[in-house]
Swiss-Prot record:
<feature type="transit peptide" description="Mitochondrion">
    <location>
        <begin position="1"/>
        <end position="41"/>
    </location>
</feature>
<keyword id="KW-0808">Transferase</keyword>
<dbReference type="InterPro" id="IPR005814">
    <property type="entry name" value="Aminotrans_3"/>
</dbReference>
<dbReference type="InterPro" id="IPR015424">
    <property type="entry name" value="PyrdxlP-dep_Trfase"/>
</dbReference>
<dbReference type="GO" id="GO:0034387">
    <property type="term" value="F:4-aminobutyrate:pyruvate transaminase activity"/>
</dbReference>
<dbReference type="Pfam" id="PF00202">
    <property type="entry name" value="Aminotran_3"/>
</dbReference>
<dbReference type="GO" id="GO:0030170">
    <property type="term" value="F:pyridoxal phosphate binding"/>
</dbReference>
<dbReference type="GO" id="GO:0004015">
    <property type="term" value="F:adenosylmethionine-8-amino-7-oxononanoate transaminase activity"/>
</dbReference>
<keyword id="KW-0032">Aminotransferase</keyword>
<dbReference type="GO" id="GO:0009102">
    <property type="term" value="P:biotin biosynthetic process"/>
</dbReference>
<feature type="binding site">
    <location>
        <position position="335"/>
    </location>
    <ligand>
        <name>substrate</name>
    </ligand>
</feature>
<feature type="binding site">
    <location>
        <begin position="166"/>
        <end position="167"/>
    </location>
    <ligand>
        <name>pyridoxal 5'-phosphate</name>
    </ligand>
</feature>
<feature type="binding site">
    <location>
        <position position="306"/>
    </location>
    <ligand>
        <name>pyridoxal 5'-phosphate</name>
    </ligand>
</feature>
<dbReference type="GO" id="GO:0009448">
    <property type="term" value="P:gamma-aminobutyric acid metabolic process"/>
</dbReference>
<comment type="function">
    <text>Transaminase that degrades gamma-amino butyric acid (GABA).</text>
</comment>
<feature type="binding site">
    <location>
        <position position="199"/>
    </location>
    <ligand>
        <name>substrate</name>
    </ligand>
</feature>
<protein>
    <recommendedName>
        <fullName>Probable gamma-aminobutyrate transaminase 3, mitochondrial</fullName>
        <ecNumber>2.6.1.96</ecNumber>
    </recommendedName>
</protein>
């Protein structure tokens, strides 16, 4: 059977792409000389579709596709998703896939939720668009702002600013923090600290905040005002005999040393995901955020919680801040806010910051930032309905009920010889493939182990996220127990097939 490989390779010529496609078609696997494979480090699954989509004669397209090697959109058949239903999506040839990533960590309520469709349709019929500039706005935007403020209970928040995505939310955070510090007469307090392996978006500023090399390389990033500190991944980065508690203490000390080196008067904010998502699903050590928050408070540095992935039930709590007792000054949300049915993101702003903006507005003038679609009435109407569903259907309790089996079922494969670590909580999981069960022994990059596993999953009708030799699962929050079992079964079958392929590659290597 033809292997639908997840090649994430760079190529300088279409002829090389064509030769790879021909090799896959002839042999069923990647050519072992594919030295460009390291470019796969931060690419999502980008399908080498040489089977089902070909039935419709679909090859190449007019899109410059996100996080996709340029030659793939010309030389390879894309996987074209045609419709969705519950936890499943279907391609244009009718093949069914369980969507074990919920789109991009986002379709929390699955596909084809009639209440969300009706909310959008009703609002389109009433008021399809009006802006929120100059103190003009719409009722859905006002209602949604109030609803979000009432749902966030980690601490009191003051105002909501609407964006269209998580990237825009984190980009806007920087401008808001700069505006705030200018209002306080602190023009030098402008630097941001983020973490290695973090993901905060792909705009110029949010990509700079992100700690993934692929978002910086060839884009002349990160911006000079962004600094990066340690990733809180205990399994990969702890010292010999270092406990999790000691590891967390060391990372907090390293953060403080970085602040002192740069000058506390220059550091404006620290941004962090409660659980790192695209960097490989990395939950922090238990006391990590307690120690980090103490350092930030000591030096009057704002804390931004990037809840774009973790908000609205993903971890088994309404917000990730609830899970780790985080008391942020600012919060970014998106994705599950509307279950991804309409583009929308938002910033939650603390009363302390909004009070400064209000009190200094006569001196500074208007907050001259926003987007045409900020608070779009249709997006807001859909988000309002999504938040109602989360509460009325007890989605948090549902996640808490099914998450243990999801976690235990996948983590049961931790003994695999190609698995280094399986980590996660709630309905989010990451698997890291390494040789010899050691974080210090990666597989040869040209083997593309994560991509091989992703291809095996896709062949079996399951879509996941691949990032180098890390793979991630983040299914819809509405998963049934039977669907959890389906994911576990397909994961196990794909893992066995990948183990066999790695054994073959090792045998050839000698």
């Amino acid at each position: 059977m033809i292997c639908r490989s997840l090649l994430l390779l760079r190529s300088n010529a279409a002829s090389k792409a064509s030769s790879i496609v021909k090799h896959v078609a002839a042999t069923g696997c990647l050519p072992e000389y594919s030295s460009e494979a390291p470019a796969r480090y931060f690419s999502s699954e980008s399908s080498l579709q040489v089977d089902s989509t070909e039935e419709n004669g679909f090859k190449g397209h007019g899109m410059l596709a996100p996080f996709t090697a340029g030659w793939q959109s010309t030389d390879l058949h894309p996987l074209v998703i045609d419709r969705s239903e519950g936890s499943y999506v279907y391609d244009i040839n009718g093949k069914k896939y369980i969507d074990a990533l919920a789109g991009l960590w986002s379709t929390a309520l699955g596909g084809n939720e009639p209440r969300l469709i009706k909310a959008a349709t009703d609002q389109l019929n009433k008021l399809p668009f009006y802006h929120s500039f100059w103190n003009r706005t719409t009722k859905p935007s006002l209602d949604l702002a109030n609803e979000i403020l009432s749902m966030f209970t980690a601490r009191e928040m003051g105002k909501i600013f609407f964006t269209n995505s998580g990237s825009e939310a984190n980009d806007s955070q920087v401008k808001l923090v700069w505006y705030y510090n200018n209002a306080l007469g602190r023009p030098n307090k402008k630097k941001f600290i983020a973490r290695s392996k973090s993901y905060h978006g792909s705009t110029l500023v949010s990509a700079s905040l992100s700690g993934l090399p692929a978002l910086h390389q060839k884009f002349d990033l990160p911006a000079p005002f962004v600094l990066h500190t340690d990733c809180p991944h205990y399994w990969r980065f702890h010292l010999p005999d270092e406990t999790e508690e000691e590891f967390a203490t060391r990372l907090a000390t390293n953060l403080e040393n970085l602040i002192l080196k740069e000058g506390p008067e220059t550091i404006a904010a620290f941004i962090a995901e409660p659980v790192m998502g695209a960097g490989g699903v990395i939950p922090p050590p238990k006391t990590y955020f307690e120690k980090i928050q103490a350092v930030l408070k000591k030096y009057d540095i704002l804390l931004i919680a990037d809840e774009v992935i973790t908000a609205f039930g993903r971890l088994g709590t309404m917000f990730g801040c609830d899970m780790y007792d985080i008391k942020p000054d600012l919060v970014s949300i998106a994705k599950a806010l509307s279950s991804a049915y309409m583009p929308i993101g938002a910033i939650l702003v603390s009363p302390e910051i909004t009070d400064v903006i209000y009190s200094q507005s006569n001196k500074l003038g208007s907050f001259a930032h926003g987007f045409t679609y900020s608070g779009h009435p249709v997006s807001c109407a859909v988000a309002i309905e999504a938040l109602k569903i989360y509460k009325e259907r007890n989605i948090i309790e549902h996640v808490q009920k099914i998450a243990p089996r999801f976690q235990e079922g996948i983590k049961a494969f931790s003994g695999s010889p190609i698995v280094g670590e399986i980590r996660g909580l709630g309905l989010i999981l990451g698997t890291e493939f390494v040789d010899n069960k050691s974080p210090n022994d990666p597989f040869p990059a040209e083997w593309g182990v994560g991509s091989l596993f992703g291809a095996e999953c896709e062949k079996r009708g399951m879509l996941i996220r691949v990032a180098g030799d890390n793979i991630m699962l983040s299914p819809p929050l509405i998963m049934t127990p039977d669907e959890v079992e389906e994911i576990i079964s397909k994961y196990g079958d794909a893992l066995k097939a990948t183990e066999e392929r790695i054994a073959e590659l090792k045998a050839k290597r000698g």
